[in-house]
UniProtKB/Swiss-Prot annotation:
This is 1-deoxy-D-xylulose 5-phosphate reductoisomerase. Belongs to the DXR family. NADPH binds at residues 13-16, 40, 122, 124, 206. Mn(2+) binds at residues 148, 150, 222. Its EC number is 1.1.1.267. Pathway: Isoprenoid biosynthesis; isopentenyl diphosphate biosynthesis via DXP pathway; isopentenyl diphosphate from 1-deoxy-D-xylulose 5-phosphate: step 1/6. One of its GO terms (biological process) is isopentenyl diphosphate biosynthetic process, methylerythritol 4-phosphate pathway involved in terpenoid biosynthetic process. InterPro entries: DXP_reductoisomerase, DXP_reductoisomerase_C, DXP_reductoisomerase_N, DXPR_C, DXPR_C_sf, NAD(P)-bd_dom_sf. Its cofactor is Mg(2+); Mn(2+). Catalyzes the NADPH-dependent rearrangement and reduction of 1-deoxy-D-xylulose-5-phosphate (DXP) to 2-C-methyl-D-erythritol 4-phosphate (MEP). 1-deoxy-D-xylulose 5-phosphate binds at residues 123, 149-150, 177, 200, 213, 218-219, 222.
Amino acid sequence: MFKKTKITILGATGSIGDSTLAVIRETNDFEVFALTAFSNVEKLAELCQEFKPKFAVVPDLSKKQKLQSLVTDVEVLVGESGLEKVSSLAEIDIVMSAIVGIAGLKPTFAAAKAGKKILLANKESLVTAGHLLIDEVVKNNAQLIPVDSEHNAIFQCIDNHDKKCLPEIDKIILTASGGPFRDKQLHELTDVTPEQACNHPNWQMGRKISVDSSTMVNKALEVIEAYWLFSVSADKIGVLIHPQSVTHSIVRYVDGSYIAQLGVPDMKTPIANAMYYPKRGSVNVESLDFTKYQLTFREACFERFEALKIVFNNLQNKNYAANIVFNAANEELVAAFLNKKIKYLEIIEVNKKVTKELNFENPKNIEEVFEIDRKTREYVDSVLG
């Protein structure tokens, strides 16, 4: 008898959750076991009615009461304990970790400790605690499969996923669209509005990640992810601006061979690849018509995109705590920008100041990760007044 793969989707109402559920709708291979959401209870209720999960998780009791008034036949859990439970239950085969921000850290670790197949879209798990998460994955024989289009592309380009091929890799090249301001100089961006920063030319994404793409913070975080996912030193990671977002990443091998993964910009492709791995599943995506594209590439200038400069410096110095500071400061500053409390260029300007002024030892456990994160946010709040 055919047994469907049971999946928990952390962050079901976000853009990655949308694409994951779109893949599930197109196939008959997956059973939604649990769904979680932070604020959009109405959308979560609709998804519960459609997919009939056993569990749903919301952040607090008021949202639990609201969800229970909208749906029946689903057990509603609350808070961090609920997230960790639905990430580690014995019945679950796959956990899609798509919560935005450091809130995704604990449930991702819970999934790793339970030996789950983790589809990782939550950048912060690797950005803030990469050394700790990789240890948990190895120790508990879990699987960590990247969902970001760039890292999933690298994953597909590496022909031996047990990492025995890593000495053969000469360079991992991440591509970046460059965002909506890729052709503008910094002095032209003084009056950028949140609406302009969120208007990504290629991808449909949430507001926070759209701003991160425009500042190249998103790519800087992806550099950190690649560092941990593929066990390579910082000098073996490069970034190219590729406006068409067709070539998702490139791997250069020591014999001079280059292997790239290409496709139209559609998150269903990397998500389906991760969900079905080690096999491939059929999903509805637009075919890539090579005759319609002229692919272009250029170097990502560190002076123009200073987020990259900050992160590469942190990695070269093995200052992993500084990456926690960088990430926490960015989250606070992007929120301030979206709420029109600071100007666009201050996102990076203030982050440079904060990352330089705060110094912590590398964390030995996730409690220390959260402590560094908390102190950084408090410091940013004091700087912003």
